[in-house]
């Protein structure tokens, strides 16, 4: 057990444009080297592109895309008698969102468009339609969990 006290959770303020807490957290995932203004410009630019293409509420598209990426189960390694098993476990809601955001940003960074805002917009729209690299990542994780269902009795 750790000897120190558990660090207090920092409160994240809602983003200024849409007033959404989840969008503010997403900006923190996009941010590199503490450059929040750059991250805001990228995210708002991406949402503007989504609004142009979808003619709807970009925040709704963002939330549905995140939901399409968020995993329900994942595998954790568990060592039992010299053998390591991949044990499927349910994902906590906070971790679901964190993984979805991480996978979305990673998939966007690997895309080929010119600017990060365009990449992010493209990945958001793909995820909204149930395709794209981030959704593929989720399906791979679910497939791994399904393949290792036999070891689910080794729960943590």
From Swiss-Prot:
Pfam families membership: Ribosomal_S7
InterPro entries named in the record: Ribosomal_uS7, Ribosomal_uS7_bac/org-type, Ribosomal_uS7_CS, Ribosomal_uS7_dom, Ribosomal_uS7_dom_sf
One GO process term, biological-process aspect: translation
Swiss-Prot/TrEMBL keywords: Ribonucleoprotein, Ribosomal protein, RNA-binding, rRNA-binding, tRNA-binding
Superkingdom: Bacteria
GO CC list: small ribosomal subunit
A GO term for molecular function: rRNA binding
HAMAP family reported in the protein's UniProt record: Ribosomal_uS7_B
Function summary: One of the primary rRNA binding proteins, it binds directly to 16S rRNA where it nucleates assembly of the head domain of the 30S subunit. Is located at the subunit interface close to the decoding center, probably blocks exit of the E-site tRNA.
Self-association state and partner proteins as the record states: Part of the 30S ribosomal subunit. Contacts proteins S9 and S11.
Family classification: Belongs to the universal ribosomal protein uS7 family.
Descriptive protein name: Small ribosomal subunit protein uS7
The encoding gene: rpsG
């Amino acid at each position: 057990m750790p000897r120190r006290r558990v660090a207090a959770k920092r409160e994240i303020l809602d983003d200024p444009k849409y007033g959404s807490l989840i969008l503010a957290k997403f900006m923190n995932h996009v941010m590199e080297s503490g450059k929040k203004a750059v991250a805001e410009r990228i995210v708002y630019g991406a949402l503007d592109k989504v609004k142009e293409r979808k003619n709807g509420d970009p925040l709704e598209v963002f939330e549905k895309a995140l939901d399409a990426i968020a995993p329900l189960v994942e595998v954790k390694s568990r060592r039992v008698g010299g053998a390591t098993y991949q044990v499927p476990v349910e994902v906590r809601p906070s971790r679901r969102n964190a993984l979805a955001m991480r996978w979305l940003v990673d998939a966007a960074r690997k895309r080929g468009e010119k600017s990060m805002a365009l990449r992010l917009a493209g990945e958001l729209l793909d995820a909204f339609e149930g395709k794209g690299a981030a959704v593929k990542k989720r399906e791979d994780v679910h497939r791994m969990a399904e393949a290792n269902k036999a070891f689910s009795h080794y729960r943590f």
